[in-house]
Amino acid sequence: MNVTALNLIPGQLSLAQLRAIYQQPVTLRLDDSATAQIEASVACVEQILAENRTAYGINTGFGLLASTRIASEDLENLQRSLVLSHAAGVGEPISDALVRLVMVLKVNSLSRGFSGIRRQVIDALIALINAEVYPHIPLKGSVGASGDLAPLAHMSLVLLGEGKARYKGEWLEATEALKVAGLTPLTLAAKEGLALLNGTQVSTAYALRGLFEGEDLFAGALACGGLTVEAVLGSRSPFDARIHAARGQRGQIDSAAAYRDLLGESSQVSQSHQNCDKVQDPYSLRCQPQVMGACLTQFRQAAEVLVVEANAVSDNPLVFAAEGDVISGGNFHAEPVAMAADNMALAIAEIGSLSERRISLMMDKHMSQLPPFLVGNGGVNSGFMIAQVTAAALASENKALAHPHSVDSLPTSANQEDHVSMAPAAGKRLWEMAENTRGILAVEWLAACQGLDLREGLKTSPKLEKARGILRDKVAFYDKDRFFAPDINAASELLATRCLNELVPANLLPSL
C-alpha cells in the first residue's frame, strides 16, 4: 500500500488530502510554523497556574463539576482520571483507516495552538500515526457534544499506557504498542487530558467517510444511469445543456454535462432508434440531471462544512495566548457535522432510489423493449426478477435510515449538556446506506450491461463501453438462470474499488 507523506500546516488540510489519509497510511510531519503558537498556549496555561487563578478545564472539575477547584498536587491525576473515566465506549472497534483519520484531525486541531497542550503530546500522536499503531476506538458512545468524549478517550488511553492498539492487524497492550512507536507512557499536564478528549474529530471522520463513499456512489450512478439510457433506447435530448442553463442550478448543470460526456453525441445504439416514435422517457431516465444534480449539491455543501470542521479548533475551553485568556464556549457541539451528514443521507438514499426505478424499468418489456426480466426463454428462466426485488428492499431500508439525526437530542451530564448533536450516529449510518446503494447500483450495472448485450451487438459510447467491459471481465452474460448472488457481490466489490470514478469529469466531486 502506498504511504502519503504530509507536511502538516495546521488548519490547511484539503479534502483531497483527507481522502488520501483515509485511504492509505500517512507519514506525518508537523510544519515548524506550528511551534510558536503551541508553546505560547502552553505558557499561558502555566502562567494561570503560577498566578493561582481559577480556570475551567485547567484546575477545575468538568461538566456539572466545573465549580470544583482542584488542588495543584492533584492536577496530573485529574487529567489521567478524566481519560480513564471517559473511556466508556461500546461496540466493535472502528477501522484502522478511520482511526488514522481521527488521529490526524486531532493533531491538526491541537497544533493550531489554542489548546494549551505540549508539543511532546502532539508528537506522540504523530509517532503512533507514522508507526501505523492505531488505538482501539469503539464505534459507539458519543452524542457529538461535548465533543466526542468517549471515543477520543479511548484514543488517548494508549498515550498513558492503558487500553490497546492494533499494529499490522494484531491487538497489542498499550505499553507494547508504545514501544513499536518508540514511545513510553506520558504523564499529562494541566488541560491536556481535556484537550485530547474535547473535539469533533470522530464525528467529522465518520461524516468524511460518508462523503467519500457518497462521491464514489455518485460517480458509479452516473455511469450506470448512462448505460441504462442506452440499454432501454432512451433519448439524449433531456441532457441538452440549454435545458439546464435555463434553470440555473449548478449541480444540475454539471451533472447534465457529465452525462453528455459519458453518452457522447451518438452511438450505434442511439442511431438504431433515432427515428422511433417515442416522445418522452420516464422520469427515472429523463430527470437524472435534476435528481443527481440536487444530490451533487448536497455533497458539495457537505464538503464545504466538513473541510472547515476538519481544520477547526473544537476544543473547550480555548486558550488565547496573546491576551492571556482562557474562554469557555461550545465549539465542541457538532451540529454542523450532523446536519451535513443528514443532508448526505438524503442524497445517498435518492441515488439508490433513482437507480432502483431504472432497474424496474428494465424489467418491464413494454417500457424497455427487451425480453421480460432481461433473459430469454422466460418462464423457464426468471432472469433479473428477484435481483430487482433485492434492489427494492435496499432502497426501502435507506428511506428509513435517511431520517435526520440532528433533530434528535437527549440531555446528558445531569442536564448540564442539555442539547447534543447526535453527529456520530448521523455519520455512521451513512456507511450502511452507502453499502445498500452500492448493492442497488451493482444490480443496475448488471442489468444495463445485460440489456445492452441483448441489443444484437450494438455498441454504446467509448466511456460506457469501458464501463461495460469492466463488468464483463468479472461477470458473464446471462443466457440462462444461474446462482445470482455472487454476481451482485462481484459487481458491488468492483464499485467499491472506485473503478468507475475515472469515467466522470475531473473536479466534478469535491474530493476527487
UniProtKB/Swiss-Prot annotation:
GO biological process terms on file = L-histidine catabolic process to glutamate and formamide; L-histidine catabolic process to glutamate and formate
What the entry lists under SUPFAM superfamilies is as follows: L-aspartase-like
Question: What is one term from the GO cellular component aspect held by the record?
Answer: cytoplasm
GO MF terms on file? histidine ammonia-lyase activity
Per the record, residues carrying 2,3-didehydroalanine (Ser) are 146
InterPro entries with a match to the protein in the record: Aromatic_Lyase, Fumarase/histidase_N, HutH, L-Aspartase-like, Phe/His_NH3-lyase_AS
Q: Which residues form the signal peptide?
A: none
Tell me where the cross-link 5-imidazolinone (Ala-Gly) is found: 145-147
Metabolic or biological pathway: Amino-acid degradation; L-histidine degradation into L-glutamate; N-formimidoyl-L-glutamate from L-histidine: step 1/3
The subcellular localization recorded is: Cytoplasm
Q: What is its EC number?
A: 4.3.1.3
Instruction: Consult the record and explain the modifications the protein receives after translation.
Output: Contains an active site 4-methylidene-imidazol-5-one (MIO), which is formed autocatalytically by cyclization and dehydration of residues Ala-Ser-Gly.
- Gene3D superfamilies named in the record: Fumarase/aspartase (Central domain), Fumarase/aspartase (N-terminal domain)
Q: Tell me what reaction this enzyme catalyses.
A: L-histidine = trans-urocanate + NH4(+)
Which UniProt key words apply to this protein?
Cytoplasm, Histidine metabolism, Lyase
Q: Source organism's superkingdom?
A: Bacteria
EC main class here is lyase
Name the family: Belongs to the PAL/histidase family.
Return the protein name.
Answer: Histidine ammonia-lyase
Species per Swiss-Prot/TrEMBL record = Pseudomonas fluorescens (strain SBW25)
